[in-house]
């Protein structure tokens, strides 16, 4: 029996790049460099903990029962997945809504600088990656929103660094068009002096300029600017250690 293409499952998971013409393994790459305030005590204990929570902003209230026991689809916001990374004297909270999946989280610290990277993992590295259609990929680029909230942390527990290498997204880092991906950005200036933050979304298997976008945010010496970071030179990725 031939199943019409429209009814076939659009998100097939695969551990290697798909051969299909209209399918794309979309990934996201988030790089952040935080310079702490001069008087902040040095803390090089990276990857102290990583917490992941997924929540929908409008979870239906269990006390209120609808007449036919069904929840209207229109009422439910897309779920947001939050990652809270504690290390280097900071608690970095990242929120992702309608974005590619994060499968790799890493950190490094050098003096008063703490770097972090959250990314998808390209197929062929032992992690499944869904293949989606071009239309779904274009919608993801338009809809994906990343929020960030950086607080001071006095956590003292030891680093929990994983021994495996840091896996990456394999998204090409050429100049691409800007898209408004970064949503709210909150920093605690008690411990954060400067912040540079870059986000890229793209096809992890083939270069496709229409499916590759980036956004950036800079907070330096008390003033904020958007879209200004050159993510290729932002941090030394070879120094990163895997937190998950």
From Swiss-Prot:
Induction: Expressed in the early phase of the viral replicative cycle. It comes from the Viruses. One of its GO terms (cellular component) is host cell cytoplasm. The keyword Metal-binding does not apply. It is found in: Host cytoplasm. Residues 54-77 have a biased composition (Acidic residues). Residues 37-53 have a biased composition (Polar residues). InterPro entries: Chemkine-bd_vir (IPR009173), Orthopox_35kDa (IPR003184), Pox_vCCI-like_sf (IPR036540). Gene3D superfamilies: Major secreted virus protein. Keywords: Early protein, Host cytoplasm. Belongs to the orthopoxvirus OPG001 family. The protein is truncated in this vaccinal strain and presumably inactive, because the lack of signal peptide prevents the protein of being secreted. In the other strains inhibits host immune defense by binding to host chemokines. Binds host CC chemokines (beta chemokines) such as RANTES with high affinity, but not CXC or C chemokines (alpha and gamma chemokines). This is Inactive chemokine-binding protein.
């Amino acid at each position: 029996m031939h199943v019409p293409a429209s009814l076939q499952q659009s998100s097939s998971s695969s551990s290697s790049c798909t051969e299909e013409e209209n399918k794309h393994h979309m990934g996201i790459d988030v790089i952040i460099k935080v310079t702490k305030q001069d008087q902040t005590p040095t803390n090089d204990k990276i990857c102290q903990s990583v917490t992941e929570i997924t929540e929908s902003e409008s979870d239906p209230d269990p006390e209120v029962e609808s007449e036919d026991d069904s929840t209207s689809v229109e009422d439910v916001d897309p779920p947001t997945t939050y990652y809270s990374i504690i290390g280097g004297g900071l608690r970095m909270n990242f929120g992702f809504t309608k974005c590619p999946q994060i499968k790799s989280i890493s950190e490094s610290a050098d003096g008063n600088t703490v770097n972090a990277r959250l990314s998808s993992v390209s197929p062929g590295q032992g992690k499944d990656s869904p293949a989606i259609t071009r239309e779904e990929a274009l919608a993801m680029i338009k809809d994906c929103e990343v929020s960030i909230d950086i607080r001071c942390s006095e956590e003292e527990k030891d680093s929990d660094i994983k021994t495996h290498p840091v896996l990456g997204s394999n998204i090409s880092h050429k100049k691409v068009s800007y898209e408004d991906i970064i949503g709210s950005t909150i920093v605690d200036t008690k411990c954060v002096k400067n912040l540079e933050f870059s986000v890229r979304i793209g096809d992890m298997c083939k270069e496709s300029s229409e499916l590759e976008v980036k956004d950036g945010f800079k907070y330096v010496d008390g003033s904020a600017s958007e879209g200004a970071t050159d993510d290729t030179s932002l941090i030394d990725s070879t120094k990163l250690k895997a937190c998950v």
